[in-house]
């Protein structure tokens, strides 16, 4: 059924495949309903109105219509009125009115005058070429047409990107992606498209219904094949399994994309910031960050997002409970992927392994972040001071040191924080919770980082060394802070007097000289202090006084 379509694509014709296939299927089903060709008459009329979708796509009307009238009684044949050609079999119905040459080989006629030229060559008896590798016959030179399909040769190269194509028309279509040319515009939304097939798909999203409904969740689909794929999410049928980590998927394309997480392949690169992606759709979504486009808006609170998935996640914040619950510990999550990632904590599975040091991770995103510790890559740069970060979240936190923004506020005491994790740790002061316990001495802490720091007190090791002077430290944060001595960096600037500081605690102490804040108060005499060190020195004086008395 698709042989003729493939021949057209080979010689450079860009066709709308979904419409073509659906037309063939409809005609085939009608033929079966009519019964045997030997016992019945048939009549088909293809009018311009039936080709309305093609007219919408190409922007111009097709031929005025193709009318075929005939009957099949013994040796009678079908007469194609459009060109007077005679077909020896009724398969022209299934192949969009094929034309015939003396050797009973057929070519597609439906998609316009250009291909009629090829048909005329067959009608006049012009010598046809047969490609020996597959046996297919063409009016054109087989070295130009069929050989490229069978051997995979791509003779047309793009000078900008180096990408290769089988024929010249495909190269021409690709070149439009570089200059941004949009030849086909959809009037309903004003959006432009490079290829007519892309426009046709867009028209379907606007016009077509979704007749195939899932009985489990009610979700609708345009094609039955999409519904069958979707059903795998309910039945748990994941036939496509990754040989590296064992993760299974409902679609082969999902497995193909997943494999890139193991190979590290990221062929789609952003021209603005250089960030690379494994999937083209992720690059398209990323580009919205640069243009500031946020088409998905929450009707509840008005917050807009660049991705529909982000809006879906956000909408769950308006509901009372996260729908996906872990059966082992009872923790709830907003989506199934987060639950799957969490479940690896209980199973201990860490499928993502670092090629440099062998460290394994439960999530691919954690491996990506870890890999930057080896490569030194810091793609996220602060526009204010030029400081670069390995993670976008770290850049967001850093920018708040310039703006002074503290969006996370404690409901108990009103204290605000620039980072959400700091608020979470602060809340444990009110609850008294200390979930992180040292296995060596039993001491408990409110933060995991505090426990990690404490664990190094049991060891004399100082694994983190300054590259400038060789000084060793127990903690990586201490190295980063120490480096400011060599670089002279002072990222914390006072808005009142303009003075700058290398460290946040020095900056906070300085701010109190302007505000007059003295949060540390002595319970014995009521005297208050702006710094904890001054407060501790004062307490020691009271202790000495009690001893001397």
UniProtKB/Swiss-Prot annotation:
Keywords: DNA-binding, Metal-binding, Nucleus, Repeat, Transcription, Transcription regulation, Zinc, Zinc-finger. A zinc finger (C2H2-type) spans 156-178, 184-206, 212-234, 240-262, 268-290, 296-318, 324-346, 352-374, 380-402, 408-430, 436-458, 464-486, 492-514, 520-542. It comes from the Eukaryota. Belongs to the krueppel C2H2-type zinc-finger protein family. This is Zinc finger protein 266. PANTHER family: FINGER PUTATIVE TRANSCRIPTION FACTOR FAMILY-RELATED (PTHR24384), ZINC FINGER PROTEIN 977 (PTHR24384:SF247). Residues 530-549 are annotated as: Disordered. GO terms for molecular function: DNA-binding transcription factor activity, RNA polymerase II-specific; RNA polymerase II transcription regulatory region sequence-specific DNA binding; zinc ion binding. It comes from Homo sapiens (Human).
């Amino acid at each position: 059924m698709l042989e003729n379509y493939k021949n057209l694509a080979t010689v450079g014709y860009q066709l709308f495949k979904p419409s073509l296939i659906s037309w063939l299927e409809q005609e085939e089903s009608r033929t079966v309903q009519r019964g045997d060709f030997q016992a019945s008459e048939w009549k088909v009329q293809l009018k311009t109105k039936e080709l309305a979708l093609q007219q919408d796509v190409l922007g111009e009307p097709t031929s005025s219509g193709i009318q075929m009238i005939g009957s099949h009684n013994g040796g009678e044949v079908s007469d194609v009125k459009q060109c007077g050609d005679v077909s020896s079999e009724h398969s022209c119905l299934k192949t969009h009115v094929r034309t015939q040459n003396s050797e009973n080989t057929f070519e597609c006629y439906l998609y316009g005058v250009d291909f009629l030229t090829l048909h005329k060559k067959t009608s006049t008896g012009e010598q046809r070429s047969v490609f020996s590798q597959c046996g297919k016959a063409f009016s054109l030179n087989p070295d130009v047409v069929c050989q490229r399909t069978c051997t995979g040769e791509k003779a047309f190269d793009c000078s900008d990107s180096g990408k290769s194509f089988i024929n010249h028309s495909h190269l021409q279509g690709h070149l439009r992606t570089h200059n941004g040319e949009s030849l086909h515009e959809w009037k309903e939304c004003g959006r432009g498209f490079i290829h007519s097939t892309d426009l046709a798909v867009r028209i379907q999203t606007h016009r077509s219904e979704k007749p195939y409904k899932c009985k489990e969740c009610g979700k609708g689909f345009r094609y039955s094949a999409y519904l069958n794929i979707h059903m795998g999410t309910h039945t748990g049928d994941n036939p496509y399994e990754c040989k590296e980590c064992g993760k299974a998927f409902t679609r082969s394309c999902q497995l193909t994309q997943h494999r890139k997480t193991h190979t590290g392949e990221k062929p789609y690169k952003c021209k603005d910031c250089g960030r690379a992606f494994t999937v083209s759709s992720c690059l398209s979504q990323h580009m919205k960050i640069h243009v500031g486009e946020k088409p998905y808006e929450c009707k509840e609170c008005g917050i807009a997002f660049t991705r529909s998935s982000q809006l879906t996640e956000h909408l769950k914040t308006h509901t009372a409970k996260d729908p996906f619950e872990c059966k082992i510990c009872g923790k709830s999550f907003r989506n199934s992927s987060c639950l799957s990632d969490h479940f690896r904590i209980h199973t201990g599975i860490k499928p993502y392994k670092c090629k440099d040091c062998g460290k394994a991770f439960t999530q691919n995103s954690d491996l990506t972040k870890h890999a930057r510790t080896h490569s030194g890559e810091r793609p996220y740069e602060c526009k204010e001071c030029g400081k670069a970060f390995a993670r976008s979240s770290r850049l967001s936190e850093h920018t708040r040191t310039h703006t002074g923004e503290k969006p996370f506020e404690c409901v108990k005491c009103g204290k605000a924080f620039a980072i959400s994790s700091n608020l979470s740790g602060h809340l444990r002061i009110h609850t008294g919770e200390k979930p992180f316990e040292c296995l060596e001495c039993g001491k408990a802490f409110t933060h995991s980082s505090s426990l990690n720091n404490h664990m190094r007190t049991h060891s004399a090791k100082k694994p983190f060394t300054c590259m400038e002077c060789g000084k060793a430290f127990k903690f990586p944060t201490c190295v980063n802070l120490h480096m400011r001595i060599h670089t002279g960096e002072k990222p914390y600037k006072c808005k009142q007097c303009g003075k700058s500081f290398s460290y946040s605690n020095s900056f906070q102490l300085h701010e109190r000289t302007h505000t007059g804040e003295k949060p540390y108060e002595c319970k014995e005499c009521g005297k208050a202090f702006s710094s904890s060190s001054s407060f501790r020195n004062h307490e020691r004086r009271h202790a000495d006084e009690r001893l001397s008395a």
